[in-house]
């Protein structure tokens, strides 16, 4: 009878849930390209890191192999004012503008607007969900578009969520995230 080594078996199990290094590299490269495109079109910048964040399970560091990557891209507040002044569903127009921006980089991928996000579906099965957001001037988070039911704005603060999760991970001897 063989001895059961729970620790080794659990580590193997955890490793089997993770993305390969190649997949992680592809995700990072796509994130940089998406960020660069948004920065070029909205911020007059070529930065691949400014004005964007991983959110959701990938951003919290709790994802197992995932087929969707959620990111928030910050758009200048002047754009919020422009789309908020539309008579009807400026939120939908904002997503259409973001979609058209991303199509400049990803013309051969399926890029579509849906609800609160612009989806980019890649041929390897990984989908990016890009949420455009506007930072509140008081630093209390962001508002983002909801195109449903005629359009509205919702609030979020992903930085607080990620910070709270990281705090709790530290409090649990780094056992919350593996």
Report the location of each language-model feature.
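Residue-level marker of positions within ordered structural domains that often coincide
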Residues: 39, 103, 135
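Histidine-centered divalent-metal-coordination microenvironment in nucleic-acid enzymes
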Residues: 57-76, 117-133
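N-terminal regions immediately upstream of nucleotidyltransferase
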Residues: 1-53, 57-66, 77-89
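Short, low-complexity, polar/charged sequence segments that are solvent-exposed and flexible
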Residues: 71-74, 90-93, 139, 148-151
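Generic hydrophobic/packing signal
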Residues: 73-75, 79, 102, 106
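Short secondary-structure junctions
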Residues: 45, 49, 104-113
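A gly/proline- and charged-residue-enriched helix-loop-helix capping module
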Residues: 90-106
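Catalytic cores of NTP-dependent nucleotidyl/adenyl transfer enzymes across multiple folds
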Residues: 22, 32, 99, 107, ...
């Amino acid at each position: 009878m063989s001895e059961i080594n729970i620790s080794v078996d659990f580590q193997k199990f955890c490793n089997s849930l993770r993305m390969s290094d190649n997949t992680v590299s592809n995700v990072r490269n796509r994130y940089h390209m998406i960020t660069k495109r948004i920065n070029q079109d909205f911020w007059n910048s070529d930065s691949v890191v400014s004005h964007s964040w991983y959110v959701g399970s990938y951003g919290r560091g709790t994802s197992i192999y995932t087929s969707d990557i959620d990111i928030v891209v910050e758009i200048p507040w002047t754009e919020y004012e422009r789309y908020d002044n539309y008579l009807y569903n400026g939120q939908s127009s904002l997503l259409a503008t973001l979609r058209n921006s991303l199509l400049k980089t990803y013309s051969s991928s399926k890029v579509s607007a849906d609800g609160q996000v612009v989806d980019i579906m890649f041929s390897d099965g990984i989908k990016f969900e890009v949420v455009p957001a506007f930072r509140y001037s008081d630093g209390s988070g962001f508002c983002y578009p909801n195109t449903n039911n005629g359009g509205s704005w919702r609030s979020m603060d992903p930085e607080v969520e990620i910070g709270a999760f990281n705090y709790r991970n530290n409090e649990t001897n780094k056992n919350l995230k593996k």
